[in-house]
Regions:
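Glycine-rich phosphate-binding P-loop
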Residues: 8-24
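Extended hydrophobic secondary-structure segments that form protein cores and membrane-embedded regions
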Residues: 7-8, 24, 39-42, 121-126, ...
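Nucleotide-state-sensitive switch-loop elements of NTP-binding domains
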Residues: 2-5, 33-97
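A conserved segment at the C-terminal end of the G1
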Residues: 19-39
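Conserved catalytic-core segment of NTP-binding enzymes
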Residues: 96-192, 196-200
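Preference for solvent-exposed, low-hydrophobicity sequence contexts
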Residues: 199-210
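A generic secondary-structure signal
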Residues: 26-27, 31, 79, 141-145
């Protein structure tokens, strides 16, 4: 499998970004038997990914006096641009969403990614319920960011808070994906299995920072 650079980004908190990060990293490690995975966590508030010992994630310090400092992203991107033999999975908290997008724009990062050997993906989560509109807005901002570049979006549809739907039609069944096929490289559905036992197991897994 080709090495890749993966950012998990969504401006809405509590939608499952760190869960998606853990699942993605485990997929690379267990299903593809890759031992060149670099996992990072930029969240200055909730270092959820760092707590999962098996992922051996690095805490990427991007704050100073409780403020996100854009220049602190520099070492992370330098590592990505100079280590094509690695696959990167970077978990980003809600508070880093806008600063990181600003960093992308200010430093022409999309242009830089045109020259890297790895594929580059931004993974974003869309949920149902009250947070649907906010997560769709986050998607739209990322869509504008990657438009016209080699960077593609992976949409994670998380049914934990309800099935994301537009006009009572599940998002996955609407023309949403087709309409945005120029920027979407794939879709992952985190299904609501409607099982108390399954939900309890997942809750215990995440609370104890375990892997599958």
């Amino acid at each position: 499998m080709k090495n890749s650079i993966n950012f998990i980004l969504q401006g809405k908190g509590g939608v499952g970004k760190s869960f998606a990060t853990a699942i993605l990293a485990q997929y690379f490690i267990d299903e593809n038997h890759m031992d060149n995975i670099v996992v990072g966590d930029t969240d200055p508030v909730n270092t959820t990914t760092v707590k999962v010992k098996r992922l051996n994630a690095d805490l990427i310090q991007i704050t100073e006096n409780s403020k996100v400092i854009q220049s602190k992203f520099d070492p992370m991107f330098e590592s990505m641009l100079t280590n094509s033999q690695n696959t990167f999975v970077i978990d980003n908290g809600a508070s880093t969403f806008l600063p990181l997008i600003q960093y992308f724009n200010d430093n022409c990062v999309m242009d830089m990614f045109e020259d890297v050997e790895q594929d580059v993906y931004i993974h974003t989560v869309i949920v149902g319920g009250q947070a649907l509109a906010d997560t769709l807005q986050g998607f739209e901002e990322l869509k504008e960011l990657v438009k016209g570049s080699k960077v593609k979006l992976i949409v994670w549809i998380n049914e934990f808070q309800g099935i994301p739907a537009l006009e009572n039609i599940p998002l996955i069944e609407t023309k949403f994906i087709e309409k945005n096929k120029d920027v979407i490289a794939g879709v992952v559905v985190i299904q609501d299995r409607k099982s108390d036992a399954f939900a309890s197991d997942i809750k215990e897994l995440t609370e104890k920072s375990l892997t599958l």
